[in-house]
Amino acid sequence: MKRLQYTGLNYEEVKQMCGDKILAPYFCLGFSMLSLMTEDGFVSVNEGDYIVQDEKGRLSVE
């Protein structure tokens, strides 16, 4: 299992982990956010959230 915290400044590191399942950052109310494609559809990733990749490569947000 891999865990990576999104800081708002580490998009390239997140992109390496998530590949094409992550969309480029966008800004909302002064905060950086990402959209992540999971098995349940797109999920927002906010600064401070953790992206988790399980042993089968499935992604989720905590």
Question: Over which residues does each language-model region extend?
Answer:
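N-terminal non-globular leader segments, chiefly Sec-dependent signal peptides
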Residues: 1-39
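Short, compact, well-ordered microdomains
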Residues: 40-62
